[in-house]
Amino acid sequence: MQGVLRKTLVVAGRDLTLETGRLAKQAGGAVMVSYGGTMVLVTATASEEPREGIDFFPLTVDYEERLYAAGKIPGGFIKREGRPSEKAILSARLIDRPIRPLFPKFYRNDVHVVATVMSVDQDCPPNVAGIIGASAALMLSAIPFAGPIGAVSVGLIDNRPVINPTLEEDSRSSLNLTVAGTANAIMMVEAGAKEVPEDLMLECIMQGHEEIKRIVAFINEFRAEALAMGLAKEKPELVAPQLDPAWESRVREIATPRLREVIYRSRDEKWSKQERDKQLDACREEINNLILEGQEEALAANPELPGLIKELITKIEKEIVRRMILTEGIRVDGRTLEEIRPITCEVGVLSRTHGSGLFTRGETQVLTVTTLGPISDEQILDDLGVDESKRYMHHYNFPPYSVGEARPIRAPGRREIGHGALAERALEPMIPSEEEFPYAIRLVSEVLGSNGSTSMGSVCGSTLSLMDAGVPIKAPVAGVAMGLVKENDQVAILTDIQGLEDALGDMDFKVAGTKKGITALQMDIKIAGIDRSILERALEQARRGRLFILDKILATIPEPRKELSPYAPRMLTITIDPDKIRDIIGPGGKIIKKIIEETGVEIDVEDDGRVFIASTDAAAGERALKIIESLTQDVETGKVYNGKVTRVTDFGAFVEVIPRVLGMPGKEGLVHISQLANERVEKVEDVVQEGDYILVKAIGFDPQGRLKLSRKEALNESTVGEGGHRHFRRAGREGGHRGLNNRRQSR
């Protein structure tokens, strides 16, 4: 097609194709990325003018999931896509994080990157295609961008890295890793893992980076060809606004000694975050007043002067803190580079919840609460992936009072959703299977105080809370946030960073795991990337910090409680013949409704015949179980029953061996007069009367399928058989009835 550029690279055995010039021609840059059967249109557009009055780069990334991409029609009454799903929000963050550091720090034009998923191949996840597309679209546009970057996902199967694993390979993988970077450096790492050791994790990251180098070269070639065809724009030469040297000298002369004094006093006197912020704010105001005193003419001639002075003061503050760390090995709160803030752990903090854990590390404090529910409480995921659900959920709340602010509380933002997902991913491999623990599990982390690393505080609080709730997790998990200060060849890696170190440092590297290995990892950086040696040091230092924190957790609660909270529901389970499900449900759900009304329990019936009963009242649960047993029990030939005589005839007695329940008929059979006793019986009434309970043995069925019973043979048996059921543990499930509804039918 004339005026259209298409270029293809084979990645992990599948074609990665970039196309431009056909779609979204008015965007600053537009690329259709195709990988396998997945197609994502990514556009990058910038405003004509910079936004006034801001001191940050206004980048927005939107990830738009269109359900037509997966051949689905949206549910609900409106039948169109609404607010982004959690998966879409996390995918938008995944695109944002590696590209953000590559824009000029002084750039103030609004930049909007939109990734629209238009076709989905389950073997080729669209979020990685979205990162590649964003990089390519930005390279085609006139937006200043120090790219390109590439991205891949990496799995680990039999201890071997697998690039861009398929859906089937992913199900066998012990690692779900996304890596993004330039040709020279890694920019972002995001991972969930099943206790992967540090050396294997590093190997997977570096293997991913090797493939990224090919993708980066491919995008550079794509841009060069697009530029030759007039399908790409030249990048403008931008010059960062700077203070006049005389002004810079004046600012440094006034600001440096004053800021240095406050920062060193904060270190030596170990000020709190609020005290340090208060003193620094006062110091900045004093510096600003001294600098601008009597400078009315200069201010009138250069309206940008106050903003430039403010930026330089912040830069000087950053230089002092970083120099102190690099040259003295001491941090702003007086800690050494590897020192972790004081930790306290508590469990059982809330009296009537199912489990609670309070984790405090310095001024960061997180309370995590566990709630257990029936499997019907699991979350159904309605997105572009295969139909699935999750029974373990973690939600993270960051109220304004946690940082001493007074502002309205809104719906959870992208940051809260991202932090919640990270903490969820860290604990997920340790959650017991449904067979072992038949509950839906919801954790909520309330950040009560924040001075850095609240997401890792949520991981530690989650471990405490789950163990307090009696959830038999496979191993405790802890998390720690690592930081980096890098100036040329000088490198300092910080363990357990606080808010100021996060703001003034070069990296926020969060690592969570058990004593055996990593379960979650997330890296965000602000410089042009880090190399293998830095990453290796950070992982090893994080391991030491994680083990230290795990010891603190285990000193508080060495193992999960043996008993659940008295306020948590108890689970009973029984397996029935799948053909008997209709006997429990009844026409229009009549029977199961009746059971629920009479006992007050919750009942889940699975397609494979497993029935789960949840109740906080043990007696009610047992009653519901007995009702279900009665409704579904078959008479077994050779089994002895204690039955009730329902009527007497000349030729024998009819005996009900499985009683009536909820108005539904029981199961009865005939004891022929010849089977009433070992001796000859002249009259049935001489042996049994209507209403009597007698032992009978099921000896078979007649040609019409009617049950034949024998009292004579039962008298020779020494024991009475019992219906089988088990408590608490149950087998896994493949979906099925949810109380009154079948999930597959109701969707």
Curated annotation (Swiss-Prot):
Mg(2+) binds at residues 502, 508. InterPro entries: ExoRNase_PH_dom1 (IPR001247), ExoRNase_PH_dom2 (IPR015847), ExoRNase_PH_dom2_sf (IPR036345), KH_dom (IPR004087), KH_dom_type_1 (IPR004088), KH_dom_type_1_sf (IPR036612), NA-bd_OB-fold (IPR012340), PNPase (IPR012162). GO terms for biological process: mRNA catabolic process; RNA processing. It catalyses: RNA(n+1) + phosphate = RNA(n) + a ribonucleoside 5'-diphosphate. It is found in: Cytoplasm. Keywords: Cytoplasm, Magnesium, Metal-binding, Nucleotidyltransferase, RNA-binding, Transferase. Its EC number is 2.7.7.8. CDD domains: KH-I_PNPase, RNase_PH_PNPase_1, RNase_PH_PNPase_2, S1_PNPase. One of its GO terms (molecular function) is polyribonucleotide nucleotidyltransferase activity. Its cofactor is Mg(2+). PROSITE patterns: KH_TYPE_1, S1. Residues 569-628 form the KH domain. Residues 638-712 form the S1 motif domain. The keyword Transferase applies. Its main location: cytoplasm. Residues 718-747 are annotated as: Disordered. GO terms for cellular component: cytosol. PANTHER family: POLYRIBONUCLEOTIDE NUCLEOTIDYLTRANSFERASE, POLYRIBONUCLEOTIDE NUCLEOTIDYLTRANSFERASE 1, MITOCHONDRIAL. Involved in mRNA degradation. Catalyzes the phosphorolysis of single-stranded polyribonucleotides processively in the 3'- to 5'-direction. Belongs to the polyribonucleotide nucleotidyltransferase family. This is Polyribonucleotide nucleotidyltransferase.
